[in-house]
Amino acid sequence: MNILMINATMKKGKSYTIGRALIDRIAREDDQVQEIFLPKDMPEFCRGCARCIREGEEHCPDYLIYLKRITGMIDEADLLIFTTPVFVYHTSGQMKALLDHYGYRWMVHRPEGSMFRKQAVCIATAAGAGMRSAIRDIRDSQIGRAHV
């Protein structure tokens, strides 16, 4: 199995720790585990230019520098694990910025068929409330996934 964990922050706090605990519990020795840390691996915000929708994702200004590698990792993964702390009842801005880059894959545009066969887990941690809304941010931005 190929597992990709996308971490909403560079900090290896509670969300990261829970994500790693899940991986340690389910991954076998021959499974491949990769991690993305935001914003290091994707520091750019979506510009809203819609070139990805009109011309193809390879025309995004951030495609060659960041998105080509991340998209390949997402497409190759069997399991996606999203980890995020809660910031004012929502996911981190950088997680939202990453997911905004995949708007071209929404159902109304060009859904990626391979996403329908993937499993995804969203992990959010908070000192109080807001975990449900943070997970909803990720779920609603999810690339063709109705149930995350």
Give the residues covered by each predicted segment:
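Short, conserved loop/helix-junction motifs that constitute active-site signature segments
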Residues: P111-R117
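Proline-centered loop/turn at the N-terminus of a beta-strand
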Residues: Q119-V121
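Conserved small/polar residues in nucleotide/adenosyl-binding loops
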Residues: A146-V148
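Short, surface-exposed alpha-helical segments at coil->helix boundaries
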Residues: Y16-R20, M131-R136
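N-terminal beta1-alpha1-beta2 submodule of the flavodoxin-like/Rossmannoid cofactor-binding fold
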Residues: M1-P111
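Short acidic/polar capping segments at secondary-structure boundaries
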Residues: T125-A129
